[in-house]
Amino acid sequence: MAKTSAIERNLKRARLAKRYAAKREQLKAIARNQELPVEERFAAQLKLAELPRNSAVTRIRNRCEITGRPRAFYRKFRMSRIAMRDYASQGMIPGMVKSSW
């Protein structure tokens, strides 16, 4: 099990990213627009830099929903390989069966 503080920190980052997503996209669009004057684009870049660092989507780490493990993460199930193996062996993941040939 991962540290509770690490899990909570990641959840806080996800909430911040969701809250600032629209503003961040708007500022990025202005900064990338080549038709606007350089001063306006630079001002948008400065405003973007003033936003909280943890509001960037790249700061969010994919973690297992059950254990909080950050590595060996399967996006489709939002679980780590260990939790997925346990749940699959108990038959708790629909359609997943142990392979046999």
UniProtKB/Swiss-Prot annotation:
Keywords: Ribonucleoprotein, Ribosomal protein, RNA-binding, rRNA-binding. InterPro entries: Ribosomal_uS14 (IPR001209), Ribosomal_uS14_bac/plastid (IPR023036), Ribosomal_uS14_CS (IPR018271). One of its GO terms (biological process) is translation. It comes from Maricaulis maris (strain MCS10). The gene is rpsN. Part of the 30S ribosomal subunit. Contacts proteins S3 and S10. This is Small ribosomal subunit protein uS14. The keyword Endoplasmic reticulum does not apply. The keyword rRNA-binding applies.
